[in-house]
Amino acid sequence: MYEVIVIGGGHAGCEASLACAKKGHTTLLITGNIKNIADMPCNPSIGGSAKGIVVREIDALGGYMGYNADISHLQIKMLNSKKGPGVRSLRCQADKTTYPENMLKELLNTPNLTIKEDLVKELIIENNEVQGIITETNEKISAKKIIITTGTYLNADILRGHNKHKGGPHGEKPSLYLSESLQKHGIKMRRLKTGTPPRVLKSSINYSECQEEKGDSELLSFSNFYEPTYDIDKQVPCYLTYTNKETHKIILDNLDKCALYSGLIVGIGPRYCPSIEDKIVKFKDKDRHQIFLEPERKNGDEIYVGGFSTTMPEELQEKLIHSMEGLHNAVITKYGYAIEYDAIDSLELKMSLESKKIKGLYSAGQINGTSGYEEAAAQGLIAGINASLSLENKDPLILKRNEAYIGVLIDDLINKGITEPYRLLTSRAEFRLLLRHDNADLRLTEIGRKVGLIDDEKYKIFKTKVENIKKLQEHLENTSFIVINAREKR
């Protein structure tokens, strides 16, 4: 018997597991492959517009993503630095090896937390309340609370060209039966889609034909509780290239060969992260589109071709990649593909992320219809906190829209619902001038302390900052300035 079972070891599952275990509750994290804990199956980055502020909020509440990004990144920069403070946020290139390794260490070193390799095929529900799970190896495990964080693995299909087969990211085994179990208990599901671009061999790129994109020249960090110590001059650069008329012609001449336009895909994809086919078809007035060449690992030789998600067959992916500057001789190491998966109708959730239909059942991440590691981690943290608070017979943590981007995210999911994978944007937050990068700790650390995830050491750091701000404010209020008219002085 565990107090909490978390199903899925992605970013939502990791934050949920850590939150429950650190609050003292016996927690079982079940994942199909322990090697894929906190995996980044798509872009090798943490943060971005609005998302970077969410990572700061996760950190302020006691989550792990922010600190892990700080100690795992290849480069980091402040986006929108020339614009107003309401839209500034951090984005880093994360090392796809180091980030998961650090997360696994944190999980293994956390008391009350057990990790098990298996897949869940059925929920045990009695009188509309969770009792436990049955795994695909037919093991029954009891629990008081269950948090589902299956990401894109639920009844997943991989699609490329005219080919379609069951599979999760990286060819991993999908979760084939849990979706049926959820529907059997009255949970409404929907079909969504996302995709990933090809990867190319670093040594096969002609970087002289590309534009270099460096990290910022000042020390930056997601975490509010640690000083950054990385070497600014050793940040790994990204590079920028563009599609062109040849690229566009190849796509337009072969739309019938890609999964997206051949009718093979039924799931709805993310509006704000479209495939390259969608970009060319929907924005025919554009002569070119930005393509980012992003390193996946410090010591690896694979480059992520950002902005080039595709469902074209392999031979056409070769032609498309070779049509762009810097990539004429590029060697593709992994081909792009789309993935379709089942997701819960988020209108069936409470603001606590607990199911309205099944007591003790929570869900977080892409199963709730979101896209992005940051949105997933934020939901996982809140679901973990609220499952724990429920075990303690306490009221759930409900963040308001004027308190946090996390509050905007959850409120949108629960009260507006989604028809496509949801992505956080600054434009979604009507209080964005209050929900800034620089004040995430001032907004949320007291809440993190109250729910039991901010320890004494972190709280001391926070209180010292608050006292210093107060002293500075008092100093400014008590300081007078005499303005001398320059003309009178002459």
Outline where the language-model segments fall.
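Beta1/beta-strand and adjacent pyrophosphate-binding region of the FAD-binding site
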Residues: 1-12
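Conserved N-terminal/central alpha/beta ligand/cofactor-binding core
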Residues: 18-124, 137, 149-166, 173, ...
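Secondary-structure transition/capping motifs at alpha-helix termini
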Residues: 21-28, 109-113, 324-328, 356, ...
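Mobile, glycine/GP-rich and aromatic-enriched active-site lid/loop segments adjacent to catalytic centers
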Residues: 71-105, 190-359, 363, 367, ...
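Core beta-strand elements of the Rossmann-like FAD/NAD(P) dinucleotide-binding domain
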Residues: 136-145
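Glycine-/small-residue-rich beta->alpha transition segments that form the dinucleotide
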Residues: 145, 150-154, 312-313, 325
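A conserved FAD-binding loop/helix module that cradles the flavin
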Residues: 164-171, 304, 368-388
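Non-catalytic terminal regions with compositionally biased, polar/charged low complexity
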Residues: 328, 381, 387-388, 393-490
